[in-house]
Every structure is written in structure tokens, then in C-alpha cells.
Amino acid sequence: MLFRSFVEYVDHMGSDLSVVNAARVSFASISTSWTDRDGKLLKYLWDHEHTSPFRHSSISFRIKAPIFVLRQWMKHQVGCAWNEQSARYTEIKEGFYYPDHFRLQDTKNKQSSIGSLSDADEDQALILIEEVYSLAYANYQQLLKMGVCREQARIVLPVATYSECIWTASTQAIMHFLQNGRAHV
């Protein structure tokens, strides 16, 4: 379950007016206040995939998600800033991702899943995962108690461990990211 995950607004730079003025610079023109004409231009730019002006405004978010989700997120971005909680500097709190249900691997398409496990197998899968999480976190704590540095103790933690980061991206990059995500849902 992703109940521990969140995405929250932190800050922004620029506005819709920044975007339309970035587009208008091509014609040595600028707008000082928002008009309906600006709204039409903004829509035109996006609808016709003239997206470079959207690079002139950005938004920062605080995100908490399992490490494997954050790594997939980072894989699909260009020109974005990313700062993540460091397991070198902080002790990681216990918290792991648990799937709502388990899917079967598609035998023909290595990138797909199909159907669901039986109820008995679902229960067994959850037990196996819980055992691994508990052991991994107990071992992490024991390594820290032994004096092992956090940088090395963290290697026993699974990628289902939750982490937090600040992500800043241009509005163009955010829209591209969201479109890619929608295409894979």
C-alpha cells in the first residue's frame, strides 16, 4: 500500500505569464499582465507541442515514496533537480511498501503482468515479504548498534524502504512526466 506516500507542493518560480512571455520573445513582444489572449496562447503552445517556453517556470515538490518508485521516477526525467534524504547522514525509520495484491508474471511479455495470485498464495507472499522486511530492518539496527557507519549499514535495507526527496522540474518536464505515466497506466 502506498498509504505512507505523498507528493506536496513546496515552491514555484515563474507563472503562466512567464511561459507566454518566453514564447513571445521570438517576436520581441512581452505581456505585463495576464489577458484572455495569453490564455489562448498558452493553450495553443501546449496543444501544438511548442513546449520549450514551459521550461521557463518550475515547481518544487516534497515526495515520499518507496525507493523503487523514486528510482523509476528519476529514470524518466531530464533537466530536473533531485535531492533525497541521505541514509549516510540520517538513520532510516522503519517503513516499507506492501502491495495491495500480487500479479502473475506474463509468460509472453517480460514487461507485463496478468491476473492475480490465489488468496492462499497472496497470504504466503505477504508473509514472505514481511519476514524479509523485519529481518532486514533488525539487521540494519544491529549493524548501527555495533558501530557500523550508516553508509554501510544501509546496504541491507530493501528498495521497498520509504525515502523522501525534493524534486524541482520545469512545467514542461512535469507535463511530459505525467503524460508518460498516463500512457503506462
Language model segments and positions:
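Family-specific signature for flavin-dependent thymidylate synthase
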Residues: 1-183
